[in-house]
């Protein structure tokens, strides 16, 4: 086997260094820390650690997901009666954000025609006292608002970072334009407790803290160093064999 030239080895090393730099640069941005896609028909996260559960007396089944998976969506029903218990019923996700800052949440949600048009996103660090992070509301229309999927993104408050027990709820709420009343997601429909919300692709992302970033970078550098040593040793052995053959 013809050994690689010194320039070829340098080019290989250069590409590896560029790749390492790209990896390190990516670590400066948000990375996925927990994900639920429900494709397995269970509430276990598909990435990272965490817990998904129902709150406020809701019930659930699995139904078609955002991309059409047969059981890829978490379908929620049994919401409060009209005019009662706003901001209490829906779903909750528990996870740790220790070692991370700039926590973000994204998810897809499908509103049935008779479901509440308004969602509140709440967060807590003790699972008891919840604070509103944001709210989303659909303006009902006769077509296109009910039985439709929506993409949601939330930047959680700074205090949600570096928490051992972060809880986030997505719950139904009264419509802001109708005093003390839920409003159906489709114009012409009436709000019903049997209306459903369906969740898919619930993702939590965050930025590693400097200590976490340093540890990941050190591991990457260590791996690169070991690779260089092994490549160097292999090339020395190949060169020696080739040179000996040349003198015969």
Model regions: which residues?
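C-terminal membrane-anchoring or membrane-association module
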Residues: 225-248
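Extracellular carbohydrate-recognition regions
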Residues: 29-56
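Extended extracellular/luminal ectodomain segments enriched in beta-structured repeat modules
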Residues: 97-106, 163
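Extended, low-complexity, turn-rich repeat/linker tracts enriched in Gly/Pro/Ser/Thr and Asp/Glu
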Residues: 99-101, 110-117
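Surface-exposed, low-complexity/disordered Ser/Thr/Gly/Pro/Asn-rich loops and linkers
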Residues: 53-99
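A short, hydrophobic C-terminal helix/tail in secreted or cell-surface proteins
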Residues: 209-227
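Terminal, low-complexity interaction segments
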Residues: 35-38, 130, 134-206
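Conserved Ser/Thr-centered positions that define the repeating blades of beta-propeller domains
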Residues: 121-124
